[in-house]
Amino acid sequence: MNCKKIFITSTLISLVSFLPGVSFSDVIQEENNPVGSVYISAKYMPTASHFGKMSIKEDSRDTKAVFGLKKDWDGVKTPSGNTNSIFTEKDYSFKYENNPFLGFAGAVGYSMNGPRIEFEVSYETFDVRNPGGNYKNDAHMYCALDTASSSTAGATTSVMVKNENLTDISLMLNACYDIMLDGMPVSPYVCAGIGTDLVSVINATNPKLSYQGKLGISYSINPEASIFIGGHFHRVIGNEFKDIATSKVFTSSGNASSAVSPGFASAILDVCHFGIEIGRFVF
């Protein structure tokens, strides 16, 4: 983990922990019989990725095979020799890490002493996995889409893409229910939500419908604030991601080809993730 991730995580967790304990409630009936109130919440979400296997192909040409860079790549991005000497990992597919640090969400909602509804915005990012840590100089982030015969030992006529991470920004409308327990400060809750995700895959952002579920328990600190812990499940509907820009056209001679130019590619990837959530309500 680098220093940037540590700083961002520490800062946002601190903000969640020290939200001011002031009331944002609006009583809508008599003061001795309040029915509903507005609330805000913030939470930290360590998340596990549960993505399918990614497949990627060019839009305008028939992709015969996908090659990854060799594991001991020296970091020189423009090869002086044949391309098939560096793109040697046949049938390469990007995989993603879990997200233990950079998952956060905030919500504004309306609670009715049991039922509640909220609008939630969340942010999560999943880095590309370096399998076994064996790939040097970020070689695991690159692949070549080869249009030549797939029987060759390396990429010959191809374009290249670079994949650093997958980012998922969710805009969700959740319907929730808090189970009130008489005389106890704890309240189990359950939520179901639908919305839209802005999913960035290989630097191309595609809007997608999505749905999620949440289950947890909250603990009332005082009438104006609660803390909660729970689990969540989130799934993106639709697995095709378009408008992925390709770059750096290579041929077997190692030079850019005037006949084959960069264009766009599409990827197929099932996006699903789950994890825990820890946060705070302020009423």
What are these model-derived regions, one by one?
Residues G36, P100-F104, T167-L171, T205-Y211, ...:
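Residues that define the transmembrane beta-barrel architecture of outer-membrane proteins
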Residues D59-S149:
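Glycine- and aromatic-enriched membrane insertion/assembly motifs of diderm outer-membrane
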Residues A107-V201, G279-F283:
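Gram-negative (and chloroplast) outer-membrane scaffold detector with strong preference
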Residues S41-M45, E120-S122, C191-G193, G230-H232:
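Transmembrane beta-strands of outer-membrane beta-barrel proteins
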Residues G52-D59, N130-K136, S200-L209, E240-T246:
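Outer-membrane beta-barrel translocator domains and adjoining extracellular loop/strand segments
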Residues M1-G36, F283:
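Cleavable N-terminal export/targeting peptides
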Residues P46, S266-F283:
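Outer-membrane beta-barrel "beta-signal"
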Residues N32-I40, N113-I117, M184-P188, P223-I227, ...:
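Outer-envelope beta-barrel architecture signal
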